[in-house]
């Protein structure tokens, strides 16, 4: 134990916390994590202010004295995306999943077992992860255009604190009543002609919220993104697509387009929102590309274990 303590002594860990992530307050879990890391010999700083997190990471990237050994993203998918956008490619990241869906954490093997998390950090093992970039902003799991991006926009506009799955009901009903499913054009390097659709999903990982699998591949370390487009508008088509994705039928449908890509341009003649990892991204047009190996995470790669 003394040798282990000495090996990590003076190594700095930043806990980047989103205090409004998920359905309830998780301060007791965060306190236990911080105390456990200190007991193992680490210097620990816990911060929830986004500007302060940016400053700490910028200083850590520029000086060896303030180097960050690991950043623990304590929140949901949006929290991880924020930290990723502030971090250098070689900065090791870890996840304490405190969000509603925790899409990325589930697929990378992170859970709320703080002892397992500390063991991963202490092992010094890391693996690389591709990232997507949308108009200069990183995303880790998914970028999407259309109805669900409108739901994200509506939720973000009224969000005041912790959320759970029921929080999504009102913005979903609002979007069902008001969203007009405008046409979008999706241009990829693999097609001379644009794909005309009303929904578009761009995945860096295999699964979406609720464990839905839109694409067959979704390997987060293959240097490619997975595109899934739906051409039909209206809510009843959305219900049909949901059932199709649930049972894996949709990929053979004539009004579905699935393709692996490295760069995509999505545009529309109308104002259409897009979202990145559950946070609003803006409005079209958007240029999306893959950044191979852009991120570093602690632990063993799930690809190696599969």
What is the predicted function of each stretch?
Residues 180-182, 196-198, 221-226, 260-262:
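A generic structural signal for short beta-strands and their flanking turns/coil linkers
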Residues 144, 148, 201-215, 280:
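Glycine-rich phosphate/pyrophosphate-binding beta-alpha loops
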Residues 78-83, 103:
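Short glycine/serine/threonine-rich phosphate/pyrophosphate-binding segments
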Residues 73-77:
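N-terminal glycine-rich "phosphate-gripper" loop used for MgATP/nucleotide binding
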Residues 2-71, 81, 119, 304:
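ATP/NTP phosphate-donor binding region
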Residues 159-167, 208-211, 216-237:
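Gly/Ser/Thr-rich active-site loops/lids in small-molecule metabolic enzymes
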Residues 26, 188, 194, 219, ...:
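ATP/nucleoside-binding phosphotransfer catalytic cores, i.e., glycine-rich phosphate-binding loops
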Residues 14-16, 40, 47-48, 86-199:
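Catalytic core of DAGKc-family lipid kinases
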């Amino acid at each position: 134990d003394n040798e282990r303590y000495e090996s990590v002594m003076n190594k700095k860990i930043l806990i980047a916390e989103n205090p409004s992530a998920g359905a309830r307050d998780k301060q007791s879990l965060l306190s236990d994590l911080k105390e456990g890391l200190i007991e193992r010999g680490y210097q620990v700083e816990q911060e929830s202010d986004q500007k302060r997190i940016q400053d700490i990471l910028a200083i850590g990237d520029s000086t060896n004295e303030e180097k960050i050994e690991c950043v623990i993203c304590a929140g949901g998918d949006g929290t991880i995306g924020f930290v990723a956008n502030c971090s250098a490619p070689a900065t090791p990241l870890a996840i304490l999943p405190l969000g509603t869906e925790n899409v990325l954490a589930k697929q990378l093997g992170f859970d709320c077992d703080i002892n397992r998390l500390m063991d991963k950090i202490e092992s010094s093992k890391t693996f690389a992860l591709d990232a997507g970039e949308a108009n200069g902003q990183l995303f880790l799991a998914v970028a999407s255009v259309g109805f669900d991006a409108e739901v994200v926009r509506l939720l973000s506009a009224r969000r005041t604190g912790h959320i759970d799955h029921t929080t999504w009901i009102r913005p979903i009903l609002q979007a069902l009543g008001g969203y007009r499913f405008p046409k979008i054009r999706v241009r990829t390097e693999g097609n001379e002609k644009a794909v005309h659709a009303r929904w578009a999903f761009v995945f860096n990982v295999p699964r979406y919220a609720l464990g839905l699998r839109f694409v067959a591949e979704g390997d987060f370390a293959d240097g490619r993104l997975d595109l899934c487009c739906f051409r039909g508008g209206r809510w009843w088509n959305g219900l049909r697509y949901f059932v199709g994705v649930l049972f894996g039928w949709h990929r053979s449908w004539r009004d579905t387009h699935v393709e692996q890509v490295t760069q995509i341009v999505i545009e529309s003649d109308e104002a259409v929102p897009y979202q990145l990892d559950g946070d609003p991204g803006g409005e079209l047009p958007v240029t999306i590309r893959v950044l191979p190996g852009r991120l570093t995470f602690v632990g063993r790669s799930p690809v190696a274990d599969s």
